[in-house]
Every structure is written in C-alpha cells, then in structure tokens.
UniProtKB/Swiss-Prot annotation:
The keyword Nuclease does not apply. Binds 1 zinc ion per subunit. The active site is at H694 (proton donor). It comes from the Bacteria. Coiled coil: none annotated. The gene is metE. GO terms for molecular function: 5-methyltetrahydropteroyltriglutamate-homocysteine S-methyltransferase activity; zinc ion binding. This is 5-methyltetrahydropteroyltriglutamate--homocysteine methyltransferase. Zn(2+) binds at H641, C643, E665, C726. It catalyses: 5-methyltetrahydropteroyltri-L-glutamate + L-homocysteine = tetrahydropteroyltri-L-glutamate + L-methionine. Pathway: Amino-acid biosynthesis; L-methionine biosynthesis via de novo pathway; L-methionine from L-homocysteine (MetE route): step 1/1.
Length: 759
C-alpha cells in the first residue's frame, strides 16, 4: 500500500469522555468488565472510522489504553512487581492496581510512580525492573486490537512503545540493570514481530521518543544493538521507527544505517531535523514520515510554511505527511464547540480537524490542488489580534529590581516565624478539598444562569465554613478555603483574566480518568479585577488560624493552556506574571499572611536537552515567578507547589524561585527528591508529600510516620512542613478525612519523639 497521509496516534478518551465515565463506573462496581470493554470497542471503532473517512492511509491500532500505554507495555512484557502478581486479580484489574493501588482486608499495595511523559502534561506509569523480573511476551492486547480492526474492515498500523524507550524510562531496583533484561526484552519483541508476520500485518510502528533526549555513547550503542538484532526478525513486516518531541541529532547517522523501512521525524519541535537530513542525507529506499502537523497545539496549520518545509525536503524520494506526535495531547474535535463564534473557531484545529489538514496538505503537495491553499493563506494574512500597548509599556519598564524580593530568605524567615507562630512540622494541605456531586451541580447551575449569584455566594460561604471547621477538627495548622468555586486550577484563572477563550468539551487526558480542559490564550493577557480575594478574605474572617491564599503561577497557567504561536512563551508568561502579581498584592492587603502560588507544571516546558535548559527556558521562567512575589512584605509567607515531575536536576533553579516554602510530590517517587535537596543544601522550607492522593487507598498513621522519619533523617526538623502530595479535589471525603487525621496524628507522634512542644 502506498502511504502519503499518516498520524502517530489518536485520542482514546472519546469525543465526550466516554472512557473516563465508563472507567469511573467500573471502579464503583456499577458496570461489569464486559460492559467496560464494549465502551472501549466503540471508541476504537469510531477512531478508525474518523481516520479512514479523512483519508488517512493506515489508521492506527493499539493506541487505545484503559490507563497508560507505557503500563500496557510493562504488562505485555511481564514486568509486573511481585506484590501486584500476588493479588491474583484479573489482567485488567492488575493493570488498575498498578495504576491506582489496591486495598482490601488482606492486601494493601501502593500505586506505581507516575512521571510526566517527556515535556507534556500527560503522565505515564514508570516501569519497574528488579532482580525477580521475568520478561515474557504477551502481546495479546496489540494483536487482538489489530484483529478487531481487521474484522471491522480497517487495515491498521499497530503502534507500540519501543524497547529502547522502555529500558531508558524504567526504574531499576535491587541491583537490576538494563543488561539484566536486555536480551529477554529483545526476544519478546522478536516474538511480537513473528506473530505480526503470521497475521500478515503490513506495518508496525515502534515509538522511540527517548531518542530525542541527550544520549551518551553507551545509550547510543544500546539503541543500535537492540535494533541490529531485532530487525533481523522483521521478514515481510515493514518497521517504522517513530520519534517525536524533538530531533534525533545524537543518533541520526546510526538510525539511517539500520534496516528500518520508515523513519518518523518531528519537524515542529525537532529544531535540527531538517539540518540533519541536509547534512547526512536520507536513504532512498526508506520512507520519511514527516511530522509537519503540530500534535500538541490547537492552532490551524500554516500551509504555506509547511509547503516551504516540504520543498526543502525535495531530495527525499518518499515522504508521508504526518503529525509531529500523538494527537492524544489535543482535544478530539471542534464539532462539540457550539458557543465559540465561527470567527474564533476557524483558527482552531483539534485531532479530527488535523486529520483533514493532513489530507489537504497532501492534496496540495502531491496533487498540486491549490484550492485549499488559497483559503488557508487568507486565514493567516488577516490580523487575528492587536497588541495591548499599555501592557507592553509595563513590560518594557521592568528592571532587575522588579524580579528581586527583599530582604533575603533567611531574614524574612524570622519575621514570618514571629507573625505566624506555627509549631514545628506545620501541617497543611495543598489547596483543594473534595468536590462532591452537589458542589459541581450548584457551580454548573450558577454558570448556566439557573441560580442567583447571591444564592451561589451563600452556598460557597457555607461550604467554606464546613471546610474550615473540618480542618480545625482534624487539627491542621494552616488552613485552606477548599476552592469550591473553582472547576480547574487554570481554567478558573483564565476565566477571570482578559485574553483567554474557553471551550465546552475540549478535553485532554492527563492520566487515567483525569482529563483537563486547557483554556486557550487568544490575545494579550491582563487582570481586569481581583480574582480570589473575595473567598480568601471570607475564609480568613471565619478562623483564627492562618488561611492560605491560593493562586496558580504564571508558568503553570501558560503550560496548562494552549499557548499562542504568534508570540514567544516568555512574552506570554511575563504578561501572566504581572496579572498574578496584582492578585498577590491584593491578597496581602486583604490580610492574607500566607499566599501559595502553585507552579505544578514548572518542569513541563523544560527542553528535553540539557544544553537548552537555561537559555531556552529557565532563564525566563524562574524570574517570571520571582516577579509575581517580589513586592510583598517580609512577613508575608510565599508558598509554591510542584507535582509529578523530576526536579532533582534543577534544584538550584527551584531554590532561585525565592519562595519561602515549597511542597513537592514525593510519596510515589519514594522520597527520592530528599537526597537531592540535601545534596544541594536547599535553603527553602519544604513539604515533601507524605501520601499519594492520586490513589484511593488510605495511608495508616504508621505509614505516614515512617515517611516523616525518612524525611527527618535527611532534613532538619525546622525545615520541614507536612502535607499530602497534591490537592484533594479528585478524592472523596471517605478517603480524605481519615487520611488527613492520620497525617496529623503521625506528625504529633514525631513532635513528641523529637521532644518538641506541640502548640
């Protein structure tokens, strides 16, 4: 089959989040596994239909997952830690135990660690390799989904994460190394190739995004050794090596020498992809799958620029128009958006629309059909938005002084200690409290205009009072108002700022059942009025304990939005920083003594290659955070929070944010960050999360006590705060309340053991 139009993968949540809702019903035991599988099958069928109808030559199979594709591969290879095997659950329930943890009368196992998938807001479950790991091939999921598509009339290209990326991302325990399982992993993949040959499959797509990371010589040799051996088994099967999220500069010369039939390169984030081809050439007998349509943003493709790039690739004999990465990072379709005007929607392209863009670009380039080009050129010729001149003047006037808080961290600490009068090991939460069906219902009624604002405000006041009373009863030291007025930590602020537009159903998977609806930065961003002061001030008026003001930081707001492409990320972030700074100062004026500015997504846009970290990102992202709090009083304590990323290698930059307290996700990662904090002589006070809120299991007092003891073995008690690892919005009260009681009880035990007076 001749291919000209391709994608890497398609969203798997369903156009109306059908998978999320089915999974949640399954977890609540409201539907059977068979009913869950039926929903999954319907989503897959709809996805294949959409691709085929848009002219995609080879729709993708095995891009579906009930939770995470990396976890699927771990299971396919048999890389399942013994504690999960011993549960003796079904294969599907074992998968969910790995992802969510499992707790019953006889068993109690934690969920596997999650990490951000390269530089995205998607999270993967980290594979574990230990001395007891026995790799054994079981690719029934991939094979069954291929056969399912075939029986429905679709000849698909199965996709799978490759052995190199699997080995690079895995966590090695009890003395195990890559070499421990290398030969067995290769044999397992050889088994897969044999089975695909027997089925008559034409193409297999092997995803190796780890090739865009900095590679050591040892890693380069590992990659080559894997594929020199594996490709001997391909027989009649065509193998596509698919890369994304950057370029493969370290191993391009080796890649083009290997016996791949197709090579997928990213020309959106792959800064050097074109230069590599121009310098080293591209083999005439191989097909280039050119990632020209952005799989991570929602703006229309500029066909003229894409055609210029294709022209520069003229020497390549065989080209397929492809996405730059999986489309799972964008919403499914704009067809669900009925409230945005056509004038706005015409600038957007979600996953389904990107299929059409690929079809049109292909028609223009291969068939010289210029009708689509003319319309696209007109779209980009017209000015979309105008610059805010007042905002530009403010930004132009910024000096180094605006990015520096005085006095120093150590001097401020004394003022804050006196002002707040907190015990050693202060206890708090990260911000949000469980949002019940009632809260979501009332908030939606208000949004639709079905509830008077005064009645809604009264409802929120009651919920805040309940939340404060609960926290006081539990014994927490620093309280939060619960964030019941907020649907999402980014969308809420976007709605209060000028410059954003919002969708109804543009959902994107973050992990498992967790979906987010990123707002879209449409134009220059400003703050017309206070956003959070009303509720923070009310909460503080109801208690004598300090209540944290809760904000999302500028870097995270941008990283969890769909950013503009007509100005730089730095420019957008500084606009947001000025807006958040205004809010911080208003909270301080309202008597809020502790203000938390979450930067949960700080790591997300960090370039994947270390040589680009500072110039391309940290040199402006860290100052943007400092700009937000540079003008507050010494006695105002600034907190920030970060979650589910690897921070160990940027600890000095995090310290340079100059916050007074930083809380980290640490429970799933087994407190690995503590060693890095100690090694770098981290000065900021820290709250490493002592239990995992993304799992429904309830930690015991002893478990939290053990976590705290591990922390205090490495950090001085005066430096430590005690908190969960993230906000509690997605949990239920049934788990949250006992977990927090256990947290406070464990803290009090430690205070007594350390002979510290508990206030």
């Amino acid at each position: 089959m001749t291919m000209k139009k391709s994608i890497i993968a398609f969203p798997r949540i369903g156009s109306n989040r059908e998978l999320k809702f089915a999974l949640e019903k399954y977890f609540r035991k409201e539907i059977t596994e068979e009913e869950l599988q039926t929903v999954a099958k319907e989503i897959r069928l709809e996805n294949w239909k959409s691709q085929k109808e848009a002219g995609i030559d080879s729709p993708i199979s095995n891009d579906f997952s009930f939770y995470d594709q990396t976890l699927d591969l771990s299971i396919a290879l048999g890389a399942i830690p013994g504690s999960y095997k011993n549960l003796e659950l079904s294969e599907l329930d074992t998968l969910f135990a790995l992802a969510r943890g499992f707790q019953d009368e006889q068993n109690d196992v934690k969920a596997r660690p999650m990490k951000k998938w390269f530089n995205t807001n998607y999270h993967y479950l980290v594979p574990e390799i230990n001395k007891d790991t026995i790799i054994k091939a079981n690719f029934s999921k991939l094979l069954n989904e291929y056969k399912e598509a075939k029986s429905a009339g679709f000849e698909t290209r199965p996709t799978i994460i490759g052995p190199y990326t699997f080995l690079v991302l895995a966590d090695y325990k009890s003395g195990a190394t890559k070499d421990t399982v290398l030969s067995d992993v290769i044999v397992a993949f050889q088994t897969l190739l044999k089975e695909l040959n027997q089925l008559g499959v034409e193409w297999l797509q092997i995803e190796e995004p780890a090739l865009v990371l900095d590679q050591t010589e040892e890693e380069k040799k590992l990659f080559v050794s894997i594929y020199e051996e594996l490709l001997k088994s391909k027989n009649n099967l065509n193998i596509l090596l698919q890369t994304y999220f950057g370029d493969v500069r370290d191993s391009y010369k080796e890649i083009i020498k290997l016996d791949f039939d197709g090579i997928g390169l990213d020309f959106i984030e792959g800064r050097d992809s074109l230069a590599l081809i121009q310098k080293y050439g591209f083999p005439k007998k191989k097909i280039l799958f050119a990632g020209l349509v952005n799989g991570k943003n929602i703006w229309r493709n500029n066909y003229q620029k894409t055609l210029e790039l294709l022209t520069a690739l003229d020497e390549v004999a065989d080209i397929v128009i492809n996405t730059s990465c999986s489309l799972q990072h964008v919403p499914v379709t704009i067809k669900n958006e009925t409230k945005l005007s056509k004038e706005i929607l015409k600038h957007f392209s979600f996953a389904t629309e990107k299929l059409n863009e690929i079809d049109e670009i292909s028609d223009i380039y291969f068939n010289k059909n210029t009708s689509f080009l003319k319309k696209n050129v007109e779209l980009f010729e017209n000015e979309r938005v105008r610059e805010n001149s007042k905002l530009k003047q403010k930004l132009d006037k910024l000096t180094e002084k605006d990015f520096t808080r005085q006095p120093s961290l150590v001097e401020r600490r004394a003022s804050q200690s006196q002002s707040l009068n907190l015990p050693v090991l202060p206890t708090t939460t990260i911000g949000s409290f469980p949002q019940t069906a009632e809260v979501r219902k009332v908030r939606l009624q208000n949004k639709r205009g079905e509830l008077r604002q005064a009645d809604y405000d009264t409802f929120l006041e009651e919920k805040i009072k309940e939340c404060l009373k609960l926290q006081e009863d539990i014994g927490l030291d620093v309280l939060v108002h619960g964030e019941f007025e907020r649907n999402d930590m980014v969308e809420y602020f976007g709605e209060k700022l000028e410059g954003y537009v919002f969708t109804q159903k543009a959902w994107v998977q973050s992990y498992g059942t967790r979906c987010v609806k990123p707002p879209i930065v449409w134009t220059d961003v400003t703050r017309p009025e206070a956003m959070t002061v009303r509720w923070s001030a009310y909460a503080q008026s109801q208690t004598s304990k300090p209540v944290k003001g809760m904000l999302t930081g500028p870097v995270t707001i941008l990283n969890w939005s769909f950013p503009r492409e007509d100005i730089s990320l730095k420019a957008s972030t500084l606009q947001l920083a000025l807006a958040v700074q205004e809010e911080v100062l208003d909270l301080e004026k309202a008597g809020i003594k502790i203000i938390q500015i979450d930067e949960a997504a700080l790591r997300e846009k960090l370039p994947l290659r270390k040589s680009d970290w500072y110039k391309e990102y940290l040199d402006w992202a860290i100052p943007a955070f400092r700009l937000v709090h540079s003008k507050v009083k010494p006695e105002t304590q600034i907190h920030t929070h970060m979650c589910y990323s690897e921070f160990e290698d940027i600890i000095p930059s995090i310290d340079a944010m100059d916050a007074d307290v930083i809380s980290f996700e640490a429970s799933r990662s087994e407190l690995s960050i503590i060693d890095a904090l100690k090694a770098h002589h981290f000065k900021t006070l820290v709250g490493p999360g002592v239990y995992d809120i993304h799992s429904p299991r309830i930690p015991s007092v002893k478990e939290i006590q053990n976590q705290l003891e591990k922390i205090l073995d490495k950090l001085p008690i005066e430096q430590v705060w005690v908190n969960p690892d993230c906000g509690l919005k997605t949990r239920g009260n049934a788990e949250t309340i006992p977990s927090l009681r256990h947290l406070v009880e464990a803290t009090r035990v430690l205070r007594k053991e350390k002979v510290v007076y508990d206030k």
